[in-house]
């Protein structure tokens, strides 16, 4: 995974099982099957890393929706964390459901209770079903206006189908600064 202006690349390992036969007959090798060792997600927004348990909303803090981490944004732009598909942009544009090419389902939730803004201060650059490359601008939001309305901008990034995996590991220490595109979460 590259950091800075380069975007993360998901690691993929290929395996090939070969049938060993002690007889003189040759057995054909089984077909190669790609296996995903891990899925690396880039930070979808620039800011300060926070543990999911520190999000002041029990649904996220108690990992009811899944596992991940959060970012307190320093910039009002959200980017695709990997190559994949925009499954759903919520009508209020504060939440994005994203599915990576390998099937990890990611919720990027901009702020807490920002659904109540009904899309005010948010601008979507994609639509449901769009296939995008990592780093594609998904949503812009007016940080100052949202803060003035009294909303917390902490942005949980949650793997909602974490039960399909072992765990999600944040690659940055809590309170570390990240740029959009930096290595952020690894799903194993």
Predicted regions span which residues?
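Single conserved hydrophobic/aromatic residue that forms the stacking wall/gate
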Residues: 1-4, 8-11
């Amino acid at each position: 995974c590259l950091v800075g202006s380069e975007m993360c690349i998901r690691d993929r390992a290929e395996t090939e099982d070969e049938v060993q036969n002690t007889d003189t007959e040759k057995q054909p090798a089984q077909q190669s099957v790609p296996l995903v060792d891990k899925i690396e997600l880039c930070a979808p927004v620039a800011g300060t890393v926070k543990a999911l348990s520190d999000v002041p909303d029990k649904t996220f803090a108690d990992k009811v929706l899944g596992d991940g981490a959060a970012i307190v944004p320093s910039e009002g732009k959200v980017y695709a964390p990997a190559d994949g598909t925009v499954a759903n942009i919520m009508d209020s544009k504060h939440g994005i459901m994203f599915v990576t090419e390998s099937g990890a389902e990611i919720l990027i939730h901009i702020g807490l209770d920002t659904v109540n803004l009904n899309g005010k201060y948010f601008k979507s650059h994609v639509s449901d079903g769009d296939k995008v490359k990592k780093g594609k601008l998904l949503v812009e939001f007016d940080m100052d206006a949202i803060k003035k309305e009294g909303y917390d901008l902490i942005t949980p990034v949650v793997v909602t189908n974490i039960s399909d995996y072992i765990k999600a590991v944040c690659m940055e220490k809590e309170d570390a600064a990240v740029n959009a595109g930096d290595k952020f979460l690894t799903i194993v």
